[in-house]
A protein has these predicted regions:
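Conserved metal-binding segment of the jelly-roll/cupin
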Residues: 100-120, 232-253, 260-262
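A short glycine-rich, His/Asp/Glu-containing loop-to-beta-strand
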Residues: 33-68, 162-205
Length: 280
């Protein structure tokens, strides 16, 4: 196995509005979340969020404590949320064993233990997408499925944004230090998410898009309300959203995305909305 990591530094909105396409993609887009028998990690300076992915194909992959953590174990001072977006898989955390099927999630609290990822079938490998944030205390590990989620049905087919927001790793379901994660599923014929747009300066966010055919693409919108930019994305890619940025998208096909947040509070509803007609 191999662990790859990179550090992404934070940007001031006054600087970011001058970025060209290549710079925007380099600083905010995470193109390769999954590689066979590798753990790919992006360590972001936005609230020190870690975004990563692991795809074990006939090997057991270990979550290593990358050098920037300066810790004996990855979870020594961190909590983590994991989603399986591939074939059936297994996550082991110390002596605990968790089987995760497609779209099932797992919360791991902080503590000194080895974490590993493996697939049940190498011909149908699991794909583990994860977010991690710093933690001031330990909370119990817990597997969470859509049956456990707080579900909000939003939008309409007429508005091209009919979707279910599955709030899964949130404080209405289980205790966390600052991590919140969920999964939004767009209905066939719907392509817009998070519109009207909003920001939450108390929290940064990361989006991971999947369940979109290879010949289609997602146009993710970011930036300040009066200085928006776009990032064209494919399935199985992620994007960082600074606390000052909107985060929305439209696509050429319906899709699903996993959102993860961290920062000042655990209030999902703490959002500052903008009128659609104010976007520039």
């Amino acid at each position: 196995m191999k662990t790859n990591y990179e550090i992404r530094y934070a940007a001031h909105p006054e600087d970011a509005k001058h970025y060209d396409t290549a710079r925007i993609r380099r600083d905010f887009l995470i193109e390769k979340v999954f590689s066979d028998n590798e753990v790919n990690i992006v360590y972001s300076m936005y609230d020190r969020m870690v975004v990563g992915g692991a795809r074990p194909v006939g090997e057991v992959l270990k979550l290593e404590a990358i050098e920037p953590l300066k810790a004996p174990y990855f979870l020594t001072r961190r909590e983590m949320g994991i989603y399986n977006v591939g074939g059936p898989g297994v996550v082991k955390a110390g002596d605990a064993v968790f089987e995760l099927d497609y779209k099932e999630a797992l919360y791991l609290g902080s503590g000194d233990r080895v974490v590993t990822f493996e697939s049940k079938d190498a011909s149908n490998p699991a794909k583990f997408y994860f977010n991690s944030l710093t933690a001031h205390r330990n909370y119990p590990d817990r597997k969470v499925t859509k049956a456990d989620a707080v579900v909000a049905e939003m939008g309409s087919l007429e508005g091209s944004n009919h979707r279910n927001i599955n709030k899964m790793l949130v404080n209405q379901v289980l205790p966390t230090c600052q991590l919140q994660m969920g999964m939004t599923e767009l209905a066939p014929g719907s392509v817009w998410n998070t519109m009207p747009a909003h920001v939450h300066s108390r929290r940064m966010e990361a989006y991971f898009y999947f369940e979109i055919p290879e010949e289609h693409a997602i146009c993710h919108f970011m930036g300040e309300v009066d200085e928006t930019r776009h990032v064209w994305m494919k399935g199985d890619q992620a994007v960082l959203s600074p606390e000052w940025s909107i985060h929305s998208a439209a696509a050429t096909h319906n899709y699903t995305f996993i959102w993860g947040m961290g920062g000042e509070n655990l209030d999902y509803g703490d959002q500052d909305f903008s009128l659609i007609t104010d976007l520039k």
